[in-house]
Each structure stands twice: as C-alpha cells, then as structure tokens.
Amino acid sequence: MHKKSLLKRIIIFLGVLGPSVVTTMAGNDGAGVVTYSVAGAQLGYAILFTLPILTILWAVTQEMGSRIAIVTGKGLGDIIRERFGVRIAMFIFAMLLIGNFGNIITNVAALKTSSEMLGIPSFPFIVITILFCFMLVTLTKYEKSQKVFLTGMVFYIAYVFSAVKSNPHWGEAVGALFVPPQGLLTKDYLIVSIAVLGTTITPWGQFFVQSYMKDKNVPISRLGYAKLEAFTGAFISNIFAFFIIIATAATLFAHGVPLESGEQAASAIKPFAGEFAGILFAVGLVNAAIIGIIIVSLSSAYAFSEFFGFTGSLDDPYKKGRIFYINFLFNMVAAAILVLTPWFPLFGIVIGTQVLNGVLLPLFFYYLLKIVNDPDIMGKYVNGKRYNYFTVASTVFIAFASIAAIAISIFGV
C-alpha cells in the first residue's frame, strides 16, 4: 500500500514538473554560462560559497511565483495591471522588455561565438536556429514544447564531463561550498558575487515561471508538488552551475590564465583539459544559448500579452495568438540583426542590461511580496509568518546587491 502511495506521488510530481525546472535551468543560459565561466576563472573555487545561498533564494522566489499562478490562474503582468494600475504596469513592462532584450542579445552573441569555435559559420547557424525556435513554439502545444525544453536540459551534462576532464581538486571544491573563503569582503569577490546573483535571479525568470505555470493549468490541489518542483529546479540548476565554475577554476584560475570573455572559455581550457573538454564546453554553450533565446523571448511575449490584455498561450493556434507569436519572433530576429552588425556596441548593451535588471529586481520583489501577502488575491495561501520573514530578508538582500551592482556598473566603485 505504501509503495502504491509513493508511486502515485511520484507520478503526480512528474505531472507538475516543468515550469520551475525549465525556468531555473534556463537561468543557466548563454549569459549565465559566460558569468559562471568568468567567475571560476577569476576567483577559482572560492566563488562556489555563493551557490548554496543563491539556491535557497532562487527556490523561494520561484515558489512564490508558482503559487501565485496556481491560486489566481493569472500571470504577474495581469495582476500588476489590475491591482496597481496602468502607469505602474507600463513602467515595469518597459524596463522588463528592455532588460529581456539585452539578455536575448547576450544569448545570441554567445551562440555566435560558440558556433564559430565549433567551426560552424555563425550567420546561417543563427538564422536556422531562430527558424527552429519559432517553428517549435508555434507548431507544438504546451506539453510537447515543454518536453523539448526538458530534453535540452540533458545537454548540460556536457559541463559535468568538461569539469571532470579538467582534473579538479574535488575535496577543495566541495569544501568551498560551505567554508567562507578568505577575501570574502574584497571588492573583486563582491563584484563577481553580484554578477552571479544577477545572472541567477532575474526579472525575466520571475515573470516567466508565473506565466508558464499559469499556461500549464496546474490545479490548486497540486500546490505542494509545485513547491517541491521549485526547490528541485533550483537545486538541479545550481548543480550544473557548480560544474561550469569548476571547469574554469581547475584550469584557468589554477594556471593564472585571465578570462575576460566567458564565450572564449571553451578555447581557453583546451590547453589544460584537452580538446574534447573544450568541445564539450562549446556544445554546452550552444545549447544554453538556444534555451536562453527561447525562454527569455517567451518571457517578453507572455509579459506583452498580459500587460496589454492579449491572448498568450503555447496552446493557442497561431491565428488566435498571432500577437503573442509575432512578439516572440520579433525579439529573436531583432537581437540577431544587432549581434550580426559589426559595429554594434555589445559590451555597452550587456552593462546597460545589468543596470536595468538591478533597478527592476527590487521593485519587482516589492510588488511580488504585496501580491503574495494579499488575502484578497491569495486567500488562505498567503505567506506564513516565518516564511515571510525569510522572503522579506531575502528581498532586502537582493535589493542591496542590486544597488551595489548599479553603483559598480556606473561608477566603478
């Protein structure tokens, strides 16, 4: 009897599985891989100390978004527009759209560089990739596209093999997760830590998980399983972040080789870990960039539909959800055109995107907490006192980190 009950619970969990896992794994997109690679090369195993903290923060924020979607049946854009007015909604939407677009540009740039490392001409590869992404989203229903997204996550195993081939000191790496490193409060450590935080917990991720969970139509009776899924997704995602960091920490940092551009990591680790490890790293980056392009573009399409009251669902046929799908395509095509333009100031766009995300993230969490603690919206599913203490403390921490990121980006302090 107990075995049947356990099997039933596993089946139910697998039925709920998807939104949070897809969102958190997409956090390891091209931009995320670039950030983790640079972090490992600059600080070595020491930066691993941030991962357990970020895993908890990420899981908690994802869980709140999932819970709001299941209880209300609405996306975040819908609720902000309805509860806080059009002006606030338009301000948040404008900043989200610009920040998302910068992130899409970063992912297309990562796709371009990594494809060239593999000897693939970037222009036709980017065109074919965008066509594939558009056809995948428009020609498949929610369940099928979700299976493709989850299957794509398997390719992150490339980073596990790449890390193993780098011959790291496993005891030192695992210990770094729990032991505060020397220089914890130095400028360099704080800057890199903020960058890792910024690539992990993002405005687009919070909007996407709620819209995607709403699109899945998970019943409220499955709320506990959705919470478990949020924590599972954050844990699995940062396991892969752990291996990405190790791959560059055990090679580039260990040999004092500087790395300023994460896209070059695949080439840089070859002399130390071998040709195969470099190829695996590049393949992983291609996969991560494609997933990032799709998910962040979908985040913008969902948000546009919610803020302006249009239909937006992966289960809608193209004719019914035309605006949703056109918005999705526009973000990808526009980003590709800019990346393929030789004179385009990519570095400035990346910095500007970080600043915008830094402004939006504390603001977003302010409204997220107001929504999740409003009994008129959430009924009995508002945050409990202890949970709320932790979420408020987490929000304050994220806000201070975001402010620090803005100061560093603008003033270089």
Spans of model-derived segments:
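Flexible loop linkers connecting adjacent transmembrane helices
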Residues: 2, 35-40, 63-88, 113-115, ...
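Juxtamembrane transmembrane-helix boundary signature
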Residues: 23, 50-83, 91-102
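Extracellular/periplasmic helix-exit of transmembrane alpha-helices
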Residues: 56-71, 213-214, 235-264
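Hydrophobic transmembrane alpha-helices that form the core helical bundles
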Residues: 67, 71, 89-119, 126, ...
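Loop-to-transmembrane helix boundary motifs in multi-pass membrane proteins
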Residues: 86-87, 123-128, 232, 236, ...
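Transmembrane alpha-helical segments of multi-pass small-molecule transport proteins
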Residues: 93, 117-139, 155-159, 320-336, ...
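Hydrophobic alpha-helical segments and their helix-loop junctions in multi-pass secondary transporters
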Residues: 154-181, 190-211, 367-376, 402-413
